[in-house]
A protein has these predicted regions:
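DNA target-recognition domains and sequence-specific DNA-contacting regions of bacterial/archaeal
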Residues: 32-154
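Non-catalytic DNA-recognition/assembly elements of restriction-modification systems
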Residues: 1-64, 156-198
Length: 198
């Protein structure tokens, strides 16, 4: 299968979850519920604090790729997954599994589940969708107060977990295909370079 086919399968799974919600109802949750969610933002990181051989990725408004690397932690407990969102850039979210240390800047929000009612990977999707509906953008910042104002409904956790297990499989297949494409591109460049050198 192609990368686009896997991406479509992921989109289809999220659409199926949305369909379950509209027919079977579900559980209503609010990100303002501090018993079920923790919502925080990071701290400012100056360029001079970044280190080329740092081990901890630093996430800023672009939460899909590290801004740089650092050798200190702001958060010390990584036993649970994290959902990141960009506060004042283009609206985007990302999911980081547990045991993956990172450092959020003051342009990056961190959302964590304290409840077993919602799958954290699914929560990243829900946050992205709901933030899009609210119009979060560079000009309409996704502040903590605004994010905590988000409410959503989720299907039974077993349905979420089943779908997110498939999403994880598809995402792994995409990474493997992207790795193969990078190797092919590198090999092609090497062949062209050798041919031009002759």
């Amino acid at each position: 299968m192609s990368i686009e086919t896997y991406r479509q399968k992921i989109a289809d799974l999220f659409a199926e979850l949305d369909a379950v919600m509209s027919t079977d109802g579900g559980y209503k949750l609010s990100l303002s519920d501090t018993q079920k969610f923790s919502v925080a933002i990071g701290k400012r990181v100056l360029d001079k604090e970044l280190v080329s051989n740092g081990k901890i990725p630093v996430y800023s408004a672009n939460v899909t790729a590290p801004f740089g690397f650092i050798d200190k932690l702001l958060i010390t407990d990584f036993s649970v997954p994290s959902v990141l969102w960009g506060i004042d850039g283009d609206w985007m979210t990302s999911y980081l599994p547990s045991d993956m240390p990172f450092y959020p800047t003051d342009h990056c929000g961190v959302l964590r589940c304290k409840t077993s009612e919602v799958n954290p990977r699914y929560l990243a999707h829900l946050l992205e969708v709901e933030g899009g509906k609210m119009g979060f953008s560079r000009s309409y910042r996704a502040s903590i107060d605004r994010v905590q104002g988000i409410t959503f409904t989720v299907p039974d956790i077993s349905i979420q977990n089943n779908a997110m297990s498939k999403v994880a499989d598809y995402e792994m297949a995409i990474k493997e295909l992207e790795g193969s494409l990078e190797k092919i591109a590198s090999r092609r460049s090497e062949i062209i370079r050798k041919a031009l050198a002759e």
